[in-house]
């Protein structure tokens, strides 16, 4: 398969699942949205590391162009819905006590946040 075709297919997969992810993100709390999208993701292929990185780049490219700009929680939910490996990983939601713009972050996997910041509270799902 050509690289261009692979990118086009990945774009199509992300765009196809985006409405379902966005509906869950906007209407359900994480307690319900994450398990719902994990069930979907567990039925998807488990990507190798390089394919998973390509998926993240595709998700980020689409996410950045959506109304309101990029959203880390939406990116996490998209990855969980599209990859069996991501569906098995911990979803972390970090918040700062002071609140305000950019006072929270969502990421996948063990350990500290992927943005290098520290959060007062981290909820793990």
PLM features: residue spans?
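Hydrophobic/aromatic-rich core segments of domains that either
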Residues: 58, 77-125
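Alpha-helical membrane-targeting segments
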Residues: 1-70
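Short, thiol/selenol-centered motifs that function as redox-active sites or metal-ligating centers
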Residues: 69-77
């Amino acid at each position: 398969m050509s690289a261009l075709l692979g990118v086009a297919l990945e774009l199509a997969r992300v765009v196809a699942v985006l409405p379902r992810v966005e509906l869950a993100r906007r209407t359900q709390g994480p307690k319900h949205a994450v398990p719902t999208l994990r069930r979907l993701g567990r039925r998807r292929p488990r990507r190798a590391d390089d394919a998973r990185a390509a998926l993240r780049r595709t998700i980020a490219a689409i996410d950045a162009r959506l109304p309101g700009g990029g959203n880390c929680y939406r990116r996490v939910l998209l990855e969980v819905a599209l990859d069996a490996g991501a569906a098995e990983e911990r979803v972390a939601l970090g918040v700062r006590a002071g609140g305000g713009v950019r006072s929270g972050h969502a990421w996948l996997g063990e350990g500290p946040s992927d943005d290098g910041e520290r959060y007062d509270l981290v909820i793990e799902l």
